[in-house]
């Protein structure tokens, strides 16, 4: 094989690798951004830090995301709000009773969001939403409202099927949301203040909260 043929024969391989690398960049940037947003918060995270952690230039980052705000929105959609289509489909296909559905909802939320780094987004929003009203409105529309709507559907299903007593859904949803928020805050903040023997076991905590919730909501408990 001639020297010229040797180099020519490798050109397609190099091009393919570069193309694959290019296709992977948005995901790598989102992973890096999630890490830094959770570690440092939104305000303290700089675009050049995200780019450096992803192994690209700042200019490359802005080829994919026009601003830090757009990058944050993409992180939220990738890790949380973009999954509501999947979660609502699970609601439609679920065949068990409503107590089992609520149990599935809370346990699955922990497995898919709460136990992952993405749960730090909740703490970030609680800390910084007031300073970034556009992001607060975005989070309300894409995470809070769809999440509460899904919980309302579960509780309404239970009432319609005669499994749950009549509830004020405007407030009952918070009986489900509040324990999850506490678990996230414990994971990302309060655990630092606790001894090892005081740390919450997430699975046991969720099981305990479910037991209390279902006892209070079930027709048989009234």
Name each region found by the language model.
Residues 1-40, 44-56, 63-70, 96:
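Basic, helix-initiating cap at the start of DNA-binding domains
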Residues 1-16, 100, 104-108, 145, ...:
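C-terminal peripheral helix-coil segments that are non-catalytic and often amphipathic
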Residues 22, 30, 76, 136, ...:
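Amphipathic, non-transmembrane alpha-helical scaffold segments
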Residues 25, 68, 79-83, 98, ...:
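Hydrophobic/aromatic residues within well-ordered alpha-helical segments
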Residues 75-117, 121, 156:
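Amphipathic alpha-helical linker/stalk segments
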Residues 111-152, 196-199:
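Short secondary-structure transition hinges
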Residues 165, 169-173:
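Membrane-interface starts of transmembrane alpha-helices
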């Amino acid at each position: 094989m001639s020297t010229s043929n040797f180099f020519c024969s490798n050109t397609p391989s190099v091009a393919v690798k570069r193309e694959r690398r290019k296709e992977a960049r948005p995901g790598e940037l989102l992973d890096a951004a999630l890490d830094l947003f959770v570690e440092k918060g939104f305000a303290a995270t700089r675009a050049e830090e995200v780019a450096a952690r992803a192994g690209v230039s700042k200019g490359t980052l802005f080829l994919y995301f026009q601003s830090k705000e757009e990058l944050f929105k993409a992180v939220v959609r990738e890790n949380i709000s973009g999954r509501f289509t999947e979660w609502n489909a699970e609601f439609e296909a679920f065949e068990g009773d409503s107590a089992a559905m609520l149990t599935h909802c809370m346990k699955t939320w922990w497995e898919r969001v709460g136990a992952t780094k993405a749960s730090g987004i909740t703490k970030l929003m609680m800390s910084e939403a007031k300073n970034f009203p556009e992001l607060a409105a975005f989070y309300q529309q894409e995470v809070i409202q769809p999440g509460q709507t899904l919980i309302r559907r579960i509780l309404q299903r239970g009432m319609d099927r005669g499994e749950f007593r009549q509830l004020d859904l405007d407030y009952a949803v918070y009986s489900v949301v509040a324990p999850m928020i506490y678990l996230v805050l414990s994971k990302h903040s309060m655990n630092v203040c606790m001894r090892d023997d005081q740390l919450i076991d997430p699975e046991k905590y969720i099981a305990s909260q479910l037991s209390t919730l279902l006892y209070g909501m079930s027709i048989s408990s009234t």
